[in-house]
């Protein structure tokens, strides 16, 4: 969004199928978490995130040279990102809070389950902005929201 949307959120709404997928994975996660099945709850989010990443890759590539299509791809991706960030927050709070911070949202609002099914525009409205006026925080190149555990770092 730094260059495509001038540092604000996409003004287009996510596609209906994206909103439905966000709702479906949120309900599945909640059912599994309620049954203390953390493994399958997180697996559901992982599968959703992989599908969203694939959708973003295909849509952003297809939208090259078409600003409206690219903004639509961003709108779909941001809606999915918000859902993944909300659902992964219990497992990886610090990384998810960095995502929230860079999206420019108040964490109490962003992680409030009363807003779990809100669109990006509805979250903006709850914070007193609109997608067109809601500024995001720029990212340096190759920024990683999630720190690696020492066991994940290769020893030379």
Where are these regions (language model features)?
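Long, charged, mostly alpha-helical binding arms that flank functional sites
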Residues: 1-69
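Basic, alpha-helical terminal appendages of large translation-related enzymes
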Residues: 43-156
């Amino acid at each position: 969004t730094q260059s495509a949307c001038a540092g604000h959120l996409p003004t287009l709404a996510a596609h209906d199928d994206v909103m439905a997928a966000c709702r479906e994975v949120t309900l599945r996660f909640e059912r599994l978490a309620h049954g203390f099945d953390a493994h399958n709850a997180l697996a559901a989010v992982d599968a959703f995130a992989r599908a969203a990443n694939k959708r973003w890759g295909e849509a952003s590539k297809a939208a090259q040279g078409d600003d409206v299509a690219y903004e639509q791809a961003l709108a779909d991706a941001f809606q999915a990102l918000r859902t993944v960030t909300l659902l992964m927050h219990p497992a990886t709070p610090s990384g998810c809070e960095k995502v929230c911070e860079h999206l420019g949202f108040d964490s109490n609002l962003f992680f409030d389950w009363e807003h779990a099914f809100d669109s990006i525009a509805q979250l903006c409205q709850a914070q007193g902005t609109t997608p067109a006026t809601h500024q995001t925080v720029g990212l340096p190149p190759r920024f990683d929201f999630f720190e690696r555990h020492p066991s994940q770092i290769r020893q030379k």
